A protein has these predicted regions:
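A generic local secondary-structure boundary/capping motif
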Residues: 1-9, 23-30, 57-61, 75-82
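Hydrophobic beta-sheet segments that form the core/acyl-binding groove
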Residues: 3-5, 13-15, 19-23, 93, ...
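Short coil/turn connectors at secondary-structure junctions
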Residues: 5-6, 11-14, 33-36, 89, ...
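RNA pseudouridine synthases
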Residues: 12-13, 19-21, 25-42
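Catalytic-pocket segment enriched in acidic/His residues
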Residues: 47-164
Length: 164
């Protein structure tokens, strides 16, 4: 189980982009050439550690067990061959079998090429680096013992049970 000490833990189903080769100053039109694959990320947020607008929320996201990924890595070519783009995938979260999030990658604020262009402009992306792409509406507080399943079409189901 994912173990977190908090009264306010939210889940976030996100497409995780896995960088496949070193990327620096990449243009959007070439961005997919740098993707090795895709996986599911559950980017838990511990909301009782939220500070304020003027301080980074480092403690909200950066905790042991807070960002499980999986269930496996799907090769970028497979996603592009079958779906045309990672921007054509449905996302869903269930909590104890009840659908709580349902969305689509085409509705993301920034598409994958935009994110790669942006980040590679000021940092070198290395093979294995992850870019998490954002979550659809429907995030709710989780409780100990709840089973959270974050799913992305063409990738799979990531299953976590929230522990203390």
């Amino acid at each position: 189980p994912t173990k977190l000490k908090s009264d306010a833990v939210d889940y976030e189903c996100e497409l995780a982009v896995v960088i496949g080769r070193t990327a620096k100053h990449v243009k959007k039109e070439n961005a997919y050439d740098y993707v090795g694959g895709y996986t599911v990320a559950n980017d838990y947020a511990i909301r009782d550690y939220l500070e304020n607008w003027y301080r980074p929320n480092f403690r909200v996201k950066n905790r042991d067990t807070c960002t499980p990924i999986g269930p496996w890595l799907v090769d970028a070519k497979d996603i592009h061959d079958i779906y045309g783009s990672p921007m054509n995938l449905s996302l869903q979260t269930t909590v104890n079998g009840k659908i709580t999030q349902s969305g689509h990658t085409r509705d993301m604020i920034f598409d994958v090429p935009t994110l790669i262009e942006y980040f590679s402009a000021f940092m070198t992306l290395q093979p294995g680096d992850l870019i998490l792409t954002g979550t659809p509406d429907g995030v709710v507080n989780c409780e100990v013992g709840k089973v959270i399943v974050t799913s992305i079409e063409g990738i799979g189901d990531l299953i976590n049970t929230l522990g203390e």
